[in-house]
Amino acid sequence: MQWHRLRFPIKLTFAIVLSLLIGFHFNLETPRWAVMTACIVAGGTAFAAGGDPFSGALRHRGMLRIIGTFLGCIAALTIMIATIRAPALMMLLCCMWAGLCVWLSSLIKIENSYALGLAGYTALIIVVSVDANGSVLLAPQFAVERCSEIIIGIVCAILADMLFSPRSVKQDIDREIDALLVDQYKLMQLCVAHGDKEEVDRLWTNLVRRTTALNGMRGNLMMESSRWQKIDERMRALNTLSLALITQAAETYLIQDSRKEYVPPQFHIFFDKSVENIGDIHKRMKIMRRVITTSGSKNTPVTLQNWVVAATRYLLLLKGIHTNSSISRIEREVLKDEPVVKMRSAESRHAMINGIRTFVATAVGSLFWLWTGWASGSGAMVMLAVITALAMRMPNPLMMAKDFLYGMIVAIPLGSLYYMVIMPSTQQSMLLLCISLGVMAFIGGILIQRRQIGTLGGLVGTINIITLDNPMTFNVTAFLDNALGQAIGCFLALLVILLIRDTSKARTGRILLNRFMYAAVAAMSTNQARRRENHLPALYHQLFMLLNIFPGDIDKFRIALTLIIGHQRLRDADIPVNEDLSAYHKQLRHTADQVIAARTDAKRHRYFEQLLAELDTYQGKLVHYDAPLNVTEPVKRLANTLKKYQNTLIQI
């Protein structure tokens, strides 16, 4: 049996039991919030990771939950103070706040959006709970208690991780950076040999995903300890180098489509030999550097030269990452990075739809609840807020809503067993209560790390409906109201997601592809500050988004990669410096920007035709000013690419 698979269930059980004990020991009014928080922080991170989560990821999620809770409590108190005499307006403002938070959370990094999503539904939960209890004057006390209980739950989850063998991401990083470079070499082998196009596509898309994942591990590592600061600096540079290796290899393949003789025979012979580990790469790089020195730069393809330089720098940083040693003078030269450009989100319409879904779902639910006085309304409102706030940030919100619905359905019989049979029998013994909840948490932990659908929702839903109040009372009617309310709330959230369809997929894809086009056009510049800007991480981040939005659509990925290659080549090209070309570069950028900004296909088509005509004129100007081949060739390739894929870039 793989005993390490039991590590997370033990952590989850300890966190839940410890938060329960602390909650009852300090006489908290609703200890279940502490228990639920420990379950959500530890369980949600494990569900996302598909196993025992890294320590950094768990702590990061915990900190975001604290921030989101405080923001939500402040917003709830502000809204209640301002609209204390108008309950309907109060609920409407809370729904607007939830929608605003979801809209903003959809525009920022998904790692940090958790805090905003939480802030949105925390305010709604506080207002709903206070209204359900019928005493608005208790709102400040309720907000303070909620913050305290959530902090207790988070501390318990982090403490459990620290006690039971915390899983550091460092060893995974060490293994991945070695394996990544070996696979980068294999991609270059295939590109030099001009092998099967489908195999090349499979390799580079896999490398893009792994490079993105490796960059995510860097964030988890920094959450573990500040002693990894030097590794963080190296990994930032390593991310750009890995992306540069992919770009140079793909360009080598692309050039050979039109120039079979691009790679000299000696390099074909060199890359025929296979590599198995990082030691083989070291040996190959030493030989390659000698071959390039002997052959001379004029007889060595530019892409191969750039690839070898990037791989050599990668090896230099790799050693420092393994040892966490002080940064040497040579490394410092490599780490003198260019300013990294950050692009604004391409999912503005997707974010707007998410915000509208949240607002509509919570507003309709709250108005129906206030109008009818429905006993299960508060439970339904809580689940509506939670699902619409959290599910909307996921790549597949419908699947997450179904997961919660299945979980809440399972929670009804499971919660009934605990609430009506097990818990009344353990009223005289805290030990028996802890054992009974611990067994459920342990089994749930095993299923959660397997990503069993409905498990996380079922565990959280069960803990929510068995109340765990202090003092404990057993009101079966209230229990059934809560159980049915949260199940109905999940169903209504699922219904809203189905009715308000997200039609932004094609628009987002078109914006992303046109941004690749703009980046390639904007690279044609004689402005040194603009040429120094590092667009590569941002461009590949958008390519990664394209991979997720259109999985399996290899043609779109090829277009994007071709435009990224064009951007990198034009960025390094020796464009003649004169006022005429500089003015024309500005005109090209303006026209490309108009293509992105156009709101109709007709306008977009007109501006695109104008851009193609301007590129033809620009090529004539380059010939007139005797521009070298390393300028005219990539410009011609860019113009041909835009003509070939014109329809795709205008309308997906």
From Swiss-Prot:
GO terms for molecular function: transmembrane transporter activity. Keywords: Cell inner membrane, Cell membrane, Membrane, Transmembrane, Transmembrane helix, Transport. InterPro entries: PHBA_efflux_AaeB/fusaric-R (IPR006726), PHBA_efflux_pump_AaeB (IPR023706). It is found in: Cell inner membrane. Its main location: membrane. GO terms for biological process: carboxylic acid transport. Coiled coil: none annotated. Pfam families: FUSC. The chain crosses the membrane at residues 8-28, 34-54, 64-84, 88-108, 118-138, 149-169, 367-387, 404-424, 429-449, 453-473, 480-500. It is a multi-pass membrane protein. One of its GO terms (cellular component) is plasma membrane. Belongs to the aromatic acid exporter ArAE (TC 2.A.85) family. Forms an efflux pump with AaeA. Could function as a metabolic relief valve, allowing to eliminate certain compounds when they accumulate to high levels in the cell. This is p-hydroxybenzoic acid efflux pump subunit AaeB. It comes from Erwinia billingiae (strain Eb661).
